[in-house]
């Protein structure tokens, strides 16, 4: 367990430019604390001491803001950066060297029994606020953009963005027929669009009212 902790600290120092020392990481990185607690809880879970496992995971959630079910299967090298609001479900599987940012959910849809949560391959990056929901596989070397909602399987070496998530890159090459609504920087503002529509409608009504007034005045002058 101690050697695993040393590996986790070394991994964080390698990946996070804000990490200045092993001592700082050990004391202040909530992602490290959550994963360390998960390993203890997972041991109890695997030995069918479910209540103890859940107590450990709940205490870790209160302390870190990260909820990892002790039944989840997590490979080596997981880095949870910032971490607040991360949720990992009971039947989720995470491969080696994955990176999860704050607000990520590896959850279910409420429709499935047994295997309910996703399986992530190795070297997967899941951006902040993204949701991966359902019992499907996300391949190796996949990147999921911030706030994406993934509801279907993603092959290896792809980048997915949007709600619902769609693949925009495969093996580093852009998919040219991807729809324009996947542009998350220049997404349309629904309030602005509605105001513009109302402005057009007001102008149309003003023209119609002016036409009626002109017709009425012409009738009076006869």
Each language-model region and where it sits:
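Terminal amphipathic alpha-helical/low-complexity segments used for targeting or macromolecular assembly
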Residues: 1-59, 175-222
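Solvent-exposed, flexible loop/coil residues
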Residues: 30-31, 36-39, 72, 78, ...
């Amino acid at each position: 367990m101690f050697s695993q902790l040393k590996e986790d600290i070394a991994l964080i120092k390698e990946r996070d430019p804000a990490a200045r020392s092993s001592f700082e990481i050990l004391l202040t990185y909530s992602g490290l604390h959550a994963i360390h607690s998960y390993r203890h809880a997972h041991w109890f879970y695997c030995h069918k001491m479910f209540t103890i496992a859940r107590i450990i995971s709940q205490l870790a959630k209160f302390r870190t803001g990260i909820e990892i079910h002790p039944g989840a299967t997590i490979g080596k090298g997981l880095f949870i950066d910032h971490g607040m609001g991360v949720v990992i479900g009971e039947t989720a599987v995470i491969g080696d060297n994955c990176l999860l940012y704050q607000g990520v959910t590896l959850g279910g849809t409420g429709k499935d029994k047994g295997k309910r949560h996703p399986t992530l391959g190795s070297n997967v990056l899941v951006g902040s606020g993204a949701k991966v929901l359902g019992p499907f596989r996300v391949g190796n070397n996949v990147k999921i953009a911030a706030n994406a909602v993934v509801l279907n399987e993603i092959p290896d070496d792809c980048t997915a963005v949007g709600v619902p998530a769609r693949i925009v890159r495969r093996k580093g090459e852009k998919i040219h027929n991807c729809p324009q609504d996947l542009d998350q920087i220049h997404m349309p503002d629904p309030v602005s669009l509605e105001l513009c529509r109302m402005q057009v409608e007001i102008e149309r009504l003003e023209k119609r009212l002016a036409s009626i007034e002109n017709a009425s005045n012409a009738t009076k002058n006869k």
